Every structure is written in structure tokens, then in C-alpha cells.
Amino acid sequence: MSERGEAPAAAASAGAGGEMPAKKQKLSSDENSNPGDLSGDENDDAVSIESGTNTERPDTPTNTPNAPGRKSWGKGKWKSKKCKYSFKCVNSLKEDHGQPLFGVQFNWHSKEGDPLVFATVGSNRVTLYECHSQGEIRLLQSYVDADADENFYTCAWTYDSNTSHPLLAVAGSRGIIRIINPITMQCIKHYVGHGNAINELKFHPRDPNLLLSVSKDHALRLWNIQTDTLVAIFGGVEGHRDEVLSADYDLLGEKIMSCGMDHSLKLWRINSKRMINAIKESYEYNPNKTNRPFISQKIHFPDFSTRDIHRNYVDCVRWLGDLILSKSCENAIVCWKPGKMEDDIDKIKPSESNVTILGRFDYSQCDIWYMRFSMDFWQKMLALGNQVGKLYVWDLEIEDPHKAKCTTLTHPKCVAAIRQTSFSRDSSILIAVCDDASIWRWDRLR
């Protein structure tokens, strides 16, 4: 799956093995990345641009006449007006492997006053950086997988519930989840279970030990990293029929929405009596006190499913309150909810066939797959990069969804596909990572 574009991914090798040594990099001050990497002229060109009229796009489910059971909300067009958020490009650097960087995540678990740390993943490399004032990006640590064929696609931060140490989970083409402790600079655990590549990792918003992974093997898995147990597998009879590309917990961690190459989005409840008991039992399980293996739950039936939102691979999904934001390779992020507008999402039945589309965030030149959007911690901003290096930032603090405001961020030297973006917890910094192994830092102007 090295080529993540319009063509379906090639088969990836799976299997365990290989230690993952840490490489502590010490850079001299002149080697450190600093704002001097961008000349004054380039800095002048790195600006926030007000978006004009939205680019029209090909027919998709979001702008064709309503399909049966689909309700449209208003005109369904999110017009771009001047966004109140402005950013300036203050730094960029390029990792030496030259391969696409597929993932980036700031550590949102740090305390106030702690350095702003983010991780990038690409090739067989995991790299940690620290953001300093005046635009500096300082290299902290770099980890290399022993297998040169590993290609990391995704990462997620959590913390050790006993020591409060930050922990970073990473996974990719080989289907192995690795847990890295940056304090001890070691890969402390690894999990093998998925039969193929892992496309996304997510930690539960209220339980730092519950890790969700989604895979090319058509399934989602929920792990307890404190007791090293596989709590549940979501998939099978009514599960995804192709690669699962993305998933997200809702704010309370009671529901999961997943999406994939089968064009579908599926809702899985983890606050059912069955799942609550399974999670409780995963904490009580001690392999030293029993010979029996932990029994993982097999969840074959989602609590809601639809294919009425997109007509192509659905490669990113996020909860926004009780609403869903999802995108495909169709130049639009769609805002929608299961059922009718007045329906309570917690009472939606698996047989429900209605969906309500509230609107769209339109953009252009983003019709390859595995391009993921992000929101800031408070869900006030939404950011997405396209395949020619443009960044779109929308203001989500709006009453009328049809008046979404957008800023386009461009730099003359940022021309490669932006695979993922990440905001610092205080929303002061936006990092974008690209197909040419470049990292771009945009600082918010107050």
C-alpha cells in the first residue's frame, strides 16, 4: 500500500518480529530547523487567502437529487466567506528518507506550560518534534523499524495511567501496532492480530487504555493496552466489505463511526451492556492467574449503516457533537446525521435507512484517497490539505451551517499532496505533512 492514491492499494506483507530501536538525535544549533529556512521573500508569500466561489465538482450523492430515504437540509452548500482565523507559514523541513509522511499528531495530553510535541509517521520511521517560539521545530527522537519494508500510516497519543508517561501508538502496512514510550525511548509493547495493513489508530477520549485500530482486513479491533487484551472485533456478517480506512469515537466514547473502501459508514455502540461487561472483564483479566485466554467479543452487526452519503472510498470520518463529518475522493467534506433531523441518535435503530445531509465543505484538487482532515481540540476549526499543497481552514463556530467561512493557506514551495494536518491543543500551531516528506508549520496570528 505504498501508493496511496486513486488506484487500490497493493497487498502489504503482514507479520511480527523486529525490534524497533530508538535513535536519539542530537543536532547542533546550526542543524536545527529554524525560521531561517524560509527567506523573507518566501515568508511574504506564505499567506492566508480568502476563498472565493466554491469550485463545482462532479455529481456525487451530496449534490444529486435526493436518493430514497435521504433528506436534504437547506441547499446543502457551504459557502466560503472570510474566516476569522489567519495563519502564517513560519517554518518547513524535510525528512531525509524522502518518502510520503502519512500521519501527524500533536500530543494533546501534555500539561499547560509543557513543550508542544508532535509525531510524524512515514516510511519505516517515527519521528518526534518539539515546537518552540519564533517558529523553531526541534528534532527530539527518531525511531526506525527493523523491517525496511514497514510503512507507517498512522499514529495516536495516549498516556500511561500508572506513571502518566506519554505513549505513542503507531501502525502501518505490516499490521503490527507498536507502543512507544518516549521517556524511556523504547518500544514497550506490540500487538499482532489484524490480518493486513492498519489504516488508523484512535484512543478512547475518556479511557487512555482503550485503543481502536481499523484495517485492510475489513475489521476494527478494540484493545486494552494496560492488560494487553483484545476486547472486541467489529466486522463479519454485516461489517465492512472492503478496507476500513478511518474511524472515530464520539466525545463521550460511547459510539464509534467507521468508514471504508466499500463507500459505507457504520455506527458501533460500545456503551451496550455486552460491551461494558467486555471492557470490565478486560481490566480484570490476569494471564498469570488463569490458563484460559481472554475471550474477545465478535460484533458482527453495526447499530446503523449507510452508503447514501458518498459514491467512492470514504477515507476520513469524525464526530462533531451528534453530527458526522466524512469525506471521500469527491472534493467535499459532508456534514450529516443518521436518521431524520429530529431523531435522537441514541435511539436510532439498525434498520434505519434515512440520513439527513446538513451541508458540505467544498474544496478543489483533492480526488486521491487517504487524505485526512482534522479539527482542533475545541472543534472550532477544521483543516484539510489537497494534492497540490493547499491548506483549507474552516471556522466551525457558526449558527448557520450554510455560512461556513474558509481560509486557504498557500506557500510557493509547498506543492506536494498534504496527507494529514494537526493542531496544537491551544490551536496556536497547525502542522501539515506531505508526500515529499516535508513538514510545514503554520502559526495562528492573534
Curated annotation (Swiss-Prot):
SMART domains on file: WD40
Signal peptide positions on this chain: none
Keywords, sorted A to Z: Chromatin regulator, Nucleus, Repeat, Repressor, Transcription, Transcription regulation, WD repeat
Subcellular location: Nucleus
WD repeats: 96-139, 147-190, 193-233, 239-280, 309-346, 364-404, 413-446
Pfam family, one: WD40
Example GO biological process: heterochromatin formation
One CC-aspect GO term: ESC/E(Z) complex
Xref: InterPro entries: PcG_WD-repeat, WD40/YVTN_repeat-like_dom_sf, WD40_repeat_CS, WD40_repeat_dom_sf, WD40_rpt
Extent of Polar residues compositional bias: 50-66
Function: Polycomb group (PcG) protein. Component of the PRC2/EED-EZH2 complex, which methylates 'Lys-9' and 'Lys-27' of histone H3, leading to transcriptional repression of the affected target gene.
Subunit structure: Component of the PRC2/EED-EZH2 complex.
Family to which the UniProt record says this protein belongs: Belongs to the WD repeat ESC family.
Name of the protein described by the UniProt record: Polycomb protein EED
Lineage: Eukaryota, Metazoa, Chordata, Craniata, Vertebrata
